[in-house]
Curated annotation (Swiss-Prot):
Top-level division of the source organism's lineage: Eukaryota
Database matches in SUPFAM superfamilies: UBC-like
GO cellular component, one term: cytoplasm
Comment block on domains: The RWD domain is required for the sumoylation enhancement activity.
Organism of this sequence: Pongo abelii
Coiled-coil spans in chain: none
Subcellular location, principal: nucleus
Its job: Enhancer of SUMO conjugation. Via its interaction with UBE2I/UBC9, increases SUMO conjugation to proteins by promoting the: binding of E1 and E2 enzymes, thioester linkage between SUMO and UBE2I/UBC9 and transfer of SUMO to specific target proteins which include HIF1A, PIAS, NFKBIA, NR3C1 and TOP1. Positively regulates the NF-kappa-B signaling pathway by enhancing the sumoylation of NF-kappa-B inhibitor alpha (NFKBIA), promoting its stabilization which consequently leads to an increased inhibition of NF-kappa-B transcriptional activity.
RWD domain mapped to chain residues: 7-114
BP GO terms, sorted: negative regulation of NF-kappaB transcription factor activity; positive regulation of hypoxia-inducible factor-1alpha signaling pathway; positive regulation of protein sumoylation
Cellular localisation: Nucleus; Cytoplasm
Subunit details: Interacts with UBE2I/UBC9, NFKBIA, HIF1A and NCOA2.
Protein name, entry field: RWD domain-containing protein 3
């Protein structure tokens, strides 16, 4: 980890030193650092709104944008997504310098103005899928592999909700013991999905206690190519045979992806 980033993390830990204000969720030489900050910001009618901000600092941060996830019991998911998008816009002006504290201060000062903007809304009306099949320069595709799902019904509903809230399309695919999640959408939203997947208590352990997902791997990530199918919705599908799963990938223009990454899971 670069020294400026270490210094920034130490400073953040000193600033957010109150009970439960600061928590490091993971550190990795390859994936960077993920941490959570709990703060409050002024919302409607001057009322304080509690905010949970999860930041992912990749190894090449601050030369690249951090991953950001925003949650609040007093905001809708659509509002949280809008707040996150505004933060990322602000982050672009701070590239190449430590920015997390600046971003936290900015959202504390500007949350009320963001929520008052008509396009922010007060419900989930923005969380809809585009039916366009034209090439979108901002469209990316990610393939994830899960080791298992113990609380399958709850887990599936959670994945469906995240995909809907973040306007992601694709497939949650089951074949025997193989579990794959194929996601298409805005790259920043894909990053936020991964943060949610890794930091939320989405499953249960062997004793039935709620736990975070620790056995997920990113098999593939790339910008959507011309030959790739545009998924119009997020669907959960089960396959009884490998050739059925293969056909799904081939229909989506992902034959090479299947051969390189999925077949290896079967062997």
């Amino acid at each position: 980890m670069a020294e400026p980033v270490q210094e920034e993390l130490s400073a953040l830990a000193a600033i957010f030193c109150g009970p439960h204000e600061w928590e490091v969720l993971s550190r990795s030489e390859t994936d960077g650092t993920v941490f959570r900050i709990h703060t409050k910001a002024e919302g409607f009618m001057d009322a304080d709104i509690p905010l949970e901000s999860v930041f992912h600092l990749p190894v090449n941060y601050p030369s690249c944008l951090p991953g950001i996830s925003i949650n609040s019991e007093q905001l809708t998911r659509a509002q949280c997504v809008t707040v996150k998008e505004k933060l990322l816009e602000q982050a672009e002006s701070l590239l190449s310098e430590p920015m997390v504290h600046e971003l936290v201060l900015w959202i504390q000062q500007n949350l009320r103005h963001i929520l008052n903007q008509p396009e922010t809304g007060s419900g989930y009306e923005k969380c809809t899928f585009s039916t366009s099949t034209t090439v979108d320069d901002g469209l990316w595709i990610t393939l994830l592999h899960l080791d298992h799902m113990r609380a399958k019904t709850k887990y599936v509903k959670t994945v469906e909700k995240w995909a809907s809230d973040l306007r992601l399309t694709g497939r949650l695919m089951f074949m025997g013991k193989i579990i794959l999640i194929l996601l298409q959408g805005d790259r920043n939203n894909l990053k936020e999905y991964l943060i949610l997947q890794k930091t939320s208590k989405v499953d249960v352990d062997s004793s039935g206690k709620k736990c975070k997902e620790k056995m997920i791997s990113v098999l593939f990530e790339t910008k959507v190519q011309t030959e790739h199918k545009r998924f119009l919705a997020f669907e959960v599908k089960e396959y009884s045979a490998l050739d059925e799963l293969q056909k799904e990938f081939e229909t989506a223009g992902l034959k090479k992806l299947f051969s390189e990454f999925v077949l290896a899971l079967v062997k």
